[in-house]
A protein has these predicted regions:
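Acidic/aromatic-lined carbohydrate-recognition and catalytic surfaces
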Residues: 1-87, 113, 125-159, 163-183, ...
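Long, compositionally biased low-complexity segments enriched in polar/charged residues
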Residues: 64, 99-102, 357
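Short, solvent-exposed loop/turn segments at the edges of secondary structure
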Residues: 86-88, 265, 275
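Active-site mouth loops of central-metabolism enzymes
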Residues: 89-103
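Short glycine- and hydrophobic/aromatic-rich loop-to-beta-strand nucleating segment
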Residues: 93, 270-273
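Active-site-proximal helices and loops of the catalytic beta/alpha 8
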Residues: 106-264, 268, 286, 290-291, ...
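Short, basic, glycine/proline-bearing loop/turn elements
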Residues: 272-286
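Glycine-rich, aromatic-lined ligand/substrate-binding cores of catalytic
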Residues: 274-277, 300, 308-312, 316
Length: 433
């Protein structure tokens, strides 16, 4: 949570919503731990106020319920990246505390009860997989037609992150299949859960993950029912593919190199840049490769395995080559996180999927070359089931080409096969009639 506490986990302030333009809108709660143990708070320097708030949230004497992790340091590639504080405004909630788990799952279940289709779990890497599999995912997996995918930040080339398997994208798609990590969550003892989460991270710091899956691959040219007996029902953002997106060919190679380690990479969310990072080599700015490269990137994301995700404005190369995040050192308008709403002014009336009339500035936005390209890709993907959820092959017995593949999806009423080449020539062989 933020470092000003949280209404239930660490109540410190009330807020006067009629006076949000002033720092005086924040009022210390009279009977709070902050008021009682740090009575001189209002006269402290800002740095001392910050330390006082942290002490309320992270010291044993104050946070007696252990609603927060009390670790004082964080080292990437070690278990402390899941128990430490990753930033000043990100105080680490104790996800191993059963009462905290109930509070969080009850809160997010309200969104699911309202019909939310999916969650993107931010900073999933900073929660242990054993914890998620025992305490969180079973709650959310009860909801039908709901998809949860997480951000496991892995700014590395290849499938493995700095902590080995433990903090790698593919790792978070699997259930606990080893007996040592099954049925040992405590509904009363947070310390037991904490200790187990640490041991779980340390036990999986290898770079030779011993589970693989063929769920994403065709068997020859035949689709087969995926085996989800070891899946945990969630997926992740494909960070290794993103990191390799200096061009589409490199991203394609990165994806193929990791796919057997996911339980099913068909569900991985693919993207080029975001509110945090661009690809390696241009990670501090929004993508700058140009319209032709963008078109090729989109071609790959919308026809290869995975669920494509486009950062707002990419369809007009909004803020290309502009620094994404410089903290408080520039107005948002000068960054890659700038407001995009000006480009959406006007009206849109849709008559069908991809069919619409528009007026005002939004009409120009929708008429941009990449917008039109994206519109057509969406229509193609929607019309071809194999491109939505099919398995794939790049086996040279069936396909030759730089970025070429075959995808197929079948069920009792559908047999959809797509031959795809992104750039350059390709040869397809042995296709069924």
């Amino acid at each position: 949570s933020g470092n000003f506490g949280e209404a239930t986990l660490a109540p410190m302030f009330t807020k006067d919503y009629s006076n949000l333009g002033s720092s005086d809108c924040m009022k210390v709660i009279p009977d709070s731990t902050l008021a009682k143990n740090y009575s001189g708070y209002s006269s402290m320097l800002p740095a001392d106020q910050y330390q006082s708030r942290l002490a309320v949230m992270k010291e044993d004497v104050n946070d007696t319920a252990h609603n927060y992790h009390h670790d004082k340091s964080l080292s990437y590639g070690s278990y402390t990246e899941q128990t430490g504080q990753m930033a000043g405004d990100c105080v680490d909630i104790n996800t191993e505390n059963p009462s905290v788990v109930k509070y969080l799952t009850d809160a997010y279940s309200k969104y699911l009860d309202m019909g939310v289709d999916a969650f993107r779990m931010d900073t999933e890497k900073h929660i242990n997989r054993w914890t998620l599999n025992h305490a969180f995912f079973p709650v959310f997996n009860q909801y039908k037609n709901f998809h949860l995918f997480g951000e496991v930040c892995a700014r590395y080339h290849g499938a493995y992150n700095e902590g080995g398997s433990s903090d790698s994208c593919f790792f978070y798609t699997w259930s606990e299949t080893e007996s040592a990590w099954q049925n040992n969550w405590s509904n009363s003892d947070w310390k037991s859960n904490y200790d187990n989460s640490v041991k779980h991270f340390q036990a999986h710091q290898n770079r030779s993950f011993d589970q693989t899956s063929d769920n994403v691959y065709l068997n020859g040219l035949s689709y087969h029912t995926p085996d989800y007996s070891k899946a945990n029902g969630t997926s992740t953002i494909d960070f290794p593919m993103h990191w390799a997106f200096k061009n589409a060919s490199a991203a394609f190679g990165a994806a193929k190199g990791e796919d057997s380690l996911y339980n099913d990479a068909t569900w991985a969310v693919t993207y080029v840049d975001s509110h945090d990072y661009g690809p390696d080599g241009q990670e501090k700015t929004r993508y700058q490769g140009g319209a032709s490269a963008w078109a090729e990137n989109m071609d790959l994301m919308f026809t290869f395995r995975g669920i494509p995700c486009i950062y707002y404005g990419s369809e007009i190369e909004f803020k290309k080559d502009v620094p994404i995040d410089v903290g408080p050192n520039a107005p948002l308008d000068k960054t890659g996180r700038a407001y995009f709403g000006d480009h959406l002014e006007g009206s849109v009336t849709a008559s069908d999927y991809g069919k619409y009339t528009a007026s005002g500035t939004v009409a120009s936005t929708l008429d941009a070359p990449l917008s039109k390209h994206l519109e057509k890709l969406n229509q193609i993907r929607r019309a071809v089931p194999a491109l939505q959820k099919g398995q794939y092959t790049t086996d040279s017995n069936y396909v030759d080409g730089n970025m070429a593949y075959i995808r197929r999806y079948t069920n009792s009423s559908v047999d959809s096969l797509a031959c795809v080449t992104i750039s350059g020539d390709a040869t397809f062989k042995g296709l069924p009639n």
